[in-house]
Design a protein with these regions (language model features):
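Eukaryote-biased recognition of intrinsically disordered, low-complexity regulatory segments
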Residues: 1-9
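C-terminal structural segment of proteins
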Residues: 10, 49-50, 62, 93-99, ...
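Short, contiguous acidic and Ser/Thr-rich linear segments
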Residues: 10-18
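A basic, amphipathic helix-loop patch mediating RNA/tRNA/ribosome contacts
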Residues: 17-48
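Residue-level signal for mature regions of secreted extracellular proteins and peptides
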Residues: 31, 36-39, 59, 99-102, ...
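Short cysteine clusters
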Residues: 38, 43-46, 66, 106-109, ...
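S4-like RNA-binding module at protein N-termini
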Residues: 50-80
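NAD(P)H dinucleotide-binding glycine-rich loop of Rossmann-like/cofactor-binding domains
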Residues: 75, 79-101
């Protein structure tokens, strides 16, 4: 039994957990405002908000419901476009802004934009812009400037939001209907009576976190299966720190990493790096464990954590754990060191010191919302101009996310200089084996590999490394 609140209605259903949330909303509940578009999580027409209990409040995030399993709604508040309408058919502030700025054309994309903007209004992160919030929404009529103007109008109104009681303020000012205020207590009561949907199948079944990859390819198959849902498993969530180590449970999302202040302290450009990873909705869904197990040769988070020399904790159905180095996890294309009754539980890495430097680079056909042609990350320790540790990784240049063993080994013990970087790049070219595909020819990818490798050093050591000398 899956139990959650859909807009203002308590839902108790025995529909299969693998059915998409979008199909349940439209076909079982006849709420047609949430649109069917790409069914790949790219266009945002199916955007809904997911409210997750957080102490005595609810944290809302936008997701694409077309690739989200229904079972993940268990114990949550799901909000569609119908759920943010005000009584007596009055328009809320976001809807008024869209109308007054002529931001609707054919109207197909409009519900998704309005829901994403409502998520922005509910978000208390001052560094997030309205454009960030709608980054995963596509307007096929290309009415973006009018939509951006609506976003600017909403942003100006939100400058007066009461940070001490944000939900009350949003209701009072007409952003949300007043039933939102009752959701925390209603969800709490529901959770006391509901089980964990993650227990609906054994670990020998198909395991799904938030579905951002597997539902793109196998949504129809997943709808028929009794899948093992991991997203609501509390033992797989959370970020923790010890004196020298950061540990992230496998269901930690990209957004949770991006918003973590301690991680940002270690990686000042963390937001800049991770804004290159997918869209707002997918970052809210995509987990690091899922990215690793997806085993894509160009998985952004795999490349990121390979460069941190991360370790993985793997657990079987009996609770027995084992640890391996992340660079030993991927064996071949889509082949990795995980048995059928095992799950990836935790990722850990040593936190950087003052002499450690980190950088992430990505080249794709579009700067944002695209799969990389080649991506790369590098972590390097330098003491007295001597490289004491090096961990560089690269995606799109091999059958697996590539940890550059030979390149890293060469760098250790060398002086940081243009000549060292040039020689290391020659070794890199011998390590990689790119192929020609839709994202570029093998020759092009080798050029990108060189440029991104150089870019790490130019970004981290601009006073010591000279591009002209590297390319001379």
């Amino acid at each position: 039994m899956i139990q959650f609140i859909l807009n203002n209605q308590i839902i108790k259903t025995s529909v299969k957990t693998g059915v998409t949330l979008l199909d349940f909303i439209r076909n079982h509940k006849q709420l047609k405002g949430t649109k069917i578009g790409c069914r790949e999580g790219d266009c945002g027409a199916c955007t809904v908000l997911v409210g997750t209990p957080n102490n005595n409040s609810i944290t809302y995030k936008s997701i694409t419901s077309c690739i989200s399993p229904l079972g993940n709604a268990n114990g949550k508040h799901i909000v569609t476009i119908e759920g943010i309408n005000l009584p007596n058919n009055l328009l809320n502030v976001t809807q008024k802004a869209m109308v007054s700025n002529y931001a609707t054309q054919c109207g197909f994309c409009t519900p998704g934009f309005v829901v994403s903007m409502t998520g922005f209004a509910l978000n208390n992160d001052k560094t997030t812009t309205c454009n960030d919030a709608i980054s995963g929404n596509i307007c096929r009529c290309t009415g973006y400037k009018s939509i951006e103007k609506a976003g600017i109008e909403i942003t100006h109104k939100l400058q007066h939001k009461n940070d001490n009681a944000p939900l009350k303020w949003l209701i009072k000012e007409g952003f949300l209907p007043d039933y939102f205020e009752s959701i925390p207590q209603r969800l709490k009561a529901l959770l006391n009576n509901s089980g964990n949907a993650s227990t609906s199948a054994s670990l020998n079944s198909t395991k799904v976190a938030n579905g951002t990859d597997v539902y793109v390819r196998y949504a129809d198959q997943m709808a028929q299966e009794n899948i093992c849902l991991l997203a609501n498993n509390p033992t797989l969530k959370g970020i923790s720190f010890t004196e020298n180590t950061c540990s992230l449970r496998a269901n930690t999302t990209v957004t949770e990493i991006l918003e973590n202040k301690q991680l940002e302290g270690f990686f000042p450009k963390l937001k800049q790096f991770l804004k290159l990873v997918s869209s707002e909705q997918i970052r809210n869904m995509g987990t690091i464990g899922g990215n690793f197990v997806n085993a894509s040769p160009i998985g952004d988070m795999s490349i990121f954590f390979l460069a941190l020399n991360a370790n993985l904790t793997i657990q079987n159905k009996n609770g027995v754990t084992r640890k391996i180095s992340f660079y030993n996890f991927h064996k071949d294309y889509k082949v990795f060191d995980l048995e059928h009754d095992e799950i990836l539980k935790e990722i850990s890495f040593k936190t950087p010191k003052v002499y450690d430097f980190f950088n992430f680079e990505k080249v794709s056909k579009r700067t944002h919302l695209d799969i990389a042609s080649v991506n790369s990350a590098g972590s390097i320790s330098v003491k007295n101009n001597c490289i004491t540790e090096a961990h560089f990784s690269m995606g799109g240049v091999a059958a697996i996310p590539k940890y550059l063993h030979k390149t890293n080994a060469y760098l250790i013990g060398k002086q940081l200089s243009n000549e060292t970087v040039k020689e290391a790049e020659k070794i890199l070219q011998l390590e990689i084996s790119p192929i020609s595909d839709v994202r570029g020819t093998a020759t092009y990818k080798r050029l990108l590999a060189r440029q991104l490798f150089f870019a790490h050093f130019l970004e981290l050591f601009p006073n010591q490394i000279d591009l002209n000398k590297l390319t001379a």
